[in-house]
Amino acid sequence: MKILVVDDERDIQTLFEQRFRKEIRDGSVQFAFAFSGEEALAYLNGHEAVLILSDINMPGMSGLELLSHIKHLLLKPPPVVMMITAYGDAENFQTAKQLGADDFLTKPVDFNLLKEKLKQIH
């Protein structure tokens, strides 16, 4: 499963790679990382992802703006999009849902919960 993680915090890459070491080693999960909404869109122009995990609050293009762009790209098959935020902000969640987000996670990410959600997608 190809997963695109979009977050302006660069240490997120190390965190995901540590938590999914076994899945990366056996090839069941592949990660790509973008550190801005703009990088994510550039990646999606030439690659596909089954799942996109995007932070909501990022400098420049926010995760909500990215979500809107992703839905307009009409990717086939459409990726599942999960939004991640450090804030349990009901307003952001509602806006993301209206823009087409499939699910939500809060920071710090509960990786056991994320792995369960991945099983439902895969």
Where are these regions (language model features)?
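A short, hydrophobic beta-strand element within the central beta-sheet of small alpha/beta folds
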Residues: P78-G88
